[in-house]
């Protein structure tokens, strides 16, 4: 019988687990271990900075076996981007070789190194309407049990309590399960590119 999953605030002691879950879900929801030569880089881009820069909106999901997922967010995407650029990314860049901007020359985790040296632009959406953003990833043992819905309820409530009128998420177009999950929760497509679909929903009544 599956053990109960609890939601708790993430701490600095969870950084290793944040990186682990990020890696194990980093290939459009699947395990990315076989393609990465640095198992921590995904987490250092997409997970750990939330515990450092937006700790009130960084949570882990935990069962009897340990951390089995996370829910992370920021109520103001522009402010969080400022934190990344001014505080988080500079020391990472100093310790990582720049692979150059040509994807044809990349190997292993070079795509992640490039994202650290040349972060992608914010999606072209109305950030006044959807200023908050979030990430949620669950290991397989936590999926299909209503845990994802409970986690999103928790994150959405935290962001709404902080005054965010709406939130958006970036989803891989190769992850139809996630896209269906967000559509079921009332998210609508805001924009789409070859690499991602951005979905959003209002959190507060206008």
From Swiss-Prot:
N-acetyltransferase domain sequence ranges: 5-205
Enzyme class (EC, first level): transferase
Recorded superkingdom: Bacteria
Annotated EC: 2.3.-.-
Biological role: Binds acetyl-CoA, but not butyryl-CoA or decanoyl-CoA. May have acetyltransferase activity.
Entry annotated with the keyword Disulfide bond: no
Family matches, as InterPro entries: Acyl_CoA_acyltransferase, Glycosyl_Hydrolase_84, GNAT_dom
Subunit field text: Monomer.
Pfam family of the protein (one): Acetyltransf_1
Family per similarity comment: Belongs to the acetyltransferase family.
GO molecular function: acyltransferase activity, transferring groups other than amino-acyl groups
The protein's name: Putative acetyltransferase OgpAT
Source species of the chain: Oceanicola granulosus (strain ATCC BAA-861 / DSM 15982 / KCTC 12143 / HTCC2516)
Keywords: Transferase
Binding site for acetyl-CoA: 135-138, 144-148, 175-177, 184
């Amino acid at each position: 019988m599956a053990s109960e999953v609890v939601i708790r605030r993430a701490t600095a002691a969870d950084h290793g687990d944040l990186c682990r879950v990020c890696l194990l879900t980093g290939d459009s929801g699947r395990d990315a271990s076989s393609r990465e030569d640095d198992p921590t880089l995904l987490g250092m881009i997409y997970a750990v900075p939330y515990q450092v820069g937006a700790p009130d909106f960084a949570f882990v999901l935990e069962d009897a076996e340990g951390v089995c997922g996370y829910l992370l967010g920021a109520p103001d995407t522009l402010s969080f981007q400022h934190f990344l650029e001014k505080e988080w990314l500079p020391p990472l860049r100093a310790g990582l070789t720049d692979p150059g901007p040509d994807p044809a020359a990349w190997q292993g985790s070079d795509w992640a190194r490039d994202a650290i040296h040349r972060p992608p632009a914010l999606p072209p959406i109305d950030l006044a309407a959807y200023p908050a953003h979030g990430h949620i990833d669950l290991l397989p043992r936590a999926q299909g049990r209503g845990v994802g819905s409970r986690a999103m309820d928790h994150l959405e409530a935290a962001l709404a309590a902080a005054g965010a009128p709406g939130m958006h998420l970036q989803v891989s177009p190769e992850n139809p399960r996630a896209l269906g999950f967000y559509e079921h929760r009332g998210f609508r497509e805001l924009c789409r590119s070859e690499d991602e679909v951005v979905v959003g929903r209002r959190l507060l009544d206008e």
